[in-house]
């Protein structure tokens, strides 16, 4: 039995924790909302994030980070991007005292504005300087609501260290979620992060009343943008974006009502403001954060990402959705295949 500390007990953290307990692991969920921790421990439910669902009874929750990390061989980060660095600093302090060197796994999908760093890079900075090998990223078509019901899916687990990727593959795989190893850590992370921006755009199209052709075209051109950023800035492998963490995650996030980013975009397409949407969503919309980092990269490195840039302008510069759509369709002719 492996002890796994799951940092973040929102919907995805709770579902992953329950799944890992299904696999026979000793799972402790860490979160900072006392009422959520109390409910998980008392009834193994998490009604704040997941209605009408129960966690595996061999899970427990705590608000004490040191308790969660004590004896953990694997630490799974399932936090909002904006919280990763501060929690990682606290993790480093505790690990330095204990001397423990657990494997770090990130299920967070985002890019940090300002630093423009991926989650694995933040964890390397704060916990394992110059030791990226001890970090694994998991990403793929996997909404918490579906995995909670043990619907079937497949997810990539990526690391620069093949043995660590295989360890995660063995620990996480079961009869309803299949994990595939991948050696392109940054590529897997870029796909998982930037598809949230494209999903906001897909939701906007639906909110504006556009049909399937428009959505398919958007997703395809969005994938081109994700690939361009991943290859040209982060040094990712182009083929990664044809996999589970690329097109797989993009499809489900751009088409499912379970996607927060898609739902946020739909409301914006219907005329609601970003502030209104974020206030009423009740959960994190990662694409709204990631698009800031993408915008910074586009400006600094002259990367051509017109869909992502249009979403940034709609969300943060107050431009009109209809105007941005007209601008997009009126751009100068370009070849389809280019990096």
Curated annotation (Swiss-Prot):
InterPro entries (alphabetical): 6-PGluconate_DH-like_C_sf, 6PGD_dom2, G3P_DH_NAD-dep, G3P_DH_NAD-dep_C, G3P_DH_NAD-dep_N, NAD(P)-bd_dom_sf
Pfam families: NAD_Gly3P_dh_C, NAD_Gly3P_dh_N
GO biological process: carbohydrate metabolic process; glycerol-3-phosphate biosynthetic process; glycerol-3-phosphate catabolic process; glycerophospholipid metabolic process; phospholipid biosynthetic process
Disulfide-bond pairs as recorded: none
Matching PROSITE patterns: NAD_G3PDH (PS00957)
Known pathway: Membrane lipid metabolism; glycerophospholipid metabolism
Catalytic residues (UniProt): 195
Signal peptide (residue range): none
Residue positions binding NADPH: 11-12, 109, 144, 260, 284, 286
Keyword check for Nucleotide-binding: yes
Keyword Lipid biosynthesis annotated: yes
Enzyme class, UniProt record, top EC level: oxidoreductase
One Gene Ontology term of the molecular function aspect: glycerol-3-phosphate dehydrogenase [NAD(P)+] activity
Enzyme Commission code(s) on record: 1.1.1.94
Localisation per UniProt entry: Cytoplasm
Superkingdom assignment: Bacteria
GO cellular component: cytosol
Catalytic activity: sn-glycerol 3-phosphate + NAD(+) = dihydroxyacetone phosphate + NADH + H(+); sn-glycerol 3-phosphate + NADP(+) = dihydroxyacetone phosphate + NADPH + H(+)
Keyword terms, alphabetized: Cytoplasm, Lipid biosynthesis, Lipid metabolism, NAD, NADP, Nucleotide-binding, Oxidoreductase, Phospholipid biosynthesis, Phospholipid metabolism
Function of the molecule: Catalyzes the reduction of the glycolytic intermediate dihydroxyacetone phosphate (DHAP) to sn-glycerol 3-phosphate (G3P), the key precursor for phospholipid synthesis.
Family: Belongs to the NAD-dependent glycerol-3-phosphate dehydrogenase family.
PANTHER family per UniProt: GLYCEROL-3-PHOSPHATE DEHYDROGENASE, GLYCEROL-3-PHOSPHATE DEHYDROGENASE [NAD(+)] 2, CHLOROPLASTIC
Protein name listed in UniProt: Glycerol-3-phosphate dehydrogenase [NAD(P)+]
Native source species: Lactobacillus acidophilus (strain ATCC 700396 / NCK56 / N2 / NCFM)
């Amino acid at each position: 039995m492996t002890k796994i500390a799951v940092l973040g007990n929102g919907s995805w953290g709770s579902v992953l924790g329950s799944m890992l307990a299904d696999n026979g692991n000793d799972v402790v969920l860490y979160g900072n909302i006392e009422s959520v921790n109390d409910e998980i421990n008392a009834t193994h439910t998490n009604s704040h994030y997941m209605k009408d669902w129960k966690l595996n009874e061999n899970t427990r929750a705590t608000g004490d980070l040191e308790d969660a990390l004590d004896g953990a061989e694997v630490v799974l980060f399932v936090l909002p991007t904006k919280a990763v660095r501060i929690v990682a600093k606290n993790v480093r302090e505790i690990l330095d005292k204990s001397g423990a060197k657990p494997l770090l796994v990130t299920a967070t999908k985002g890019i940090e504005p300002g630093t423009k760093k991926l989650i694995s890079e933040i964890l390397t900075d704060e916990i394992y300087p110059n030791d990226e090998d001890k970090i694994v990223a998991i990403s793929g078509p996997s909404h918490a609501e579906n995995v909670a019901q043990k619907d079937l899916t497949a997810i990539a687990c990526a690391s620069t260290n093949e043995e660590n990727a295989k360890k995660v593959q063995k620990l996480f795989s079961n009869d309803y979620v299949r994990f595939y190893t991948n050696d392109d850590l940054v590529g897997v992370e870029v796909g998982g992060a930037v598809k949230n921006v494209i999903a906001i755009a897909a939701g906007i199209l639906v909110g504006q009343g556009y049909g399937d052709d428009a959505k398919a075209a958007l997703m395809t051109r969005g994938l081109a943008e994700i690939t361009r950023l991943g290859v040209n800035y982060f040094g990712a492998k182009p083929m990664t974006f044809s996999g589970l963490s690329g097109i797989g995650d993009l499809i489900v996030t751009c088409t499912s009502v379970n996607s927060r980013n898609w739902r946020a975009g739909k409301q914006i397409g219907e005329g609601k403001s970003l502030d209104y949407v974020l206030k009423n969503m009740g959960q994190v919309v990662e694409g709204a954060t990631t698009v800031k980092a993408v915008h910074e990269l586009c400006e600094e490195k002259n990367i051509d990402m017109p869909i992502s840039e249009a979403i940034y302008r709609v969300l943060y510069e107050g431009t009109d959705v209809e105007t941005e759509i007209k601008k997009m369709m009126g751009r100068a002719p370009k070849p389809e295949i280019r990096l």
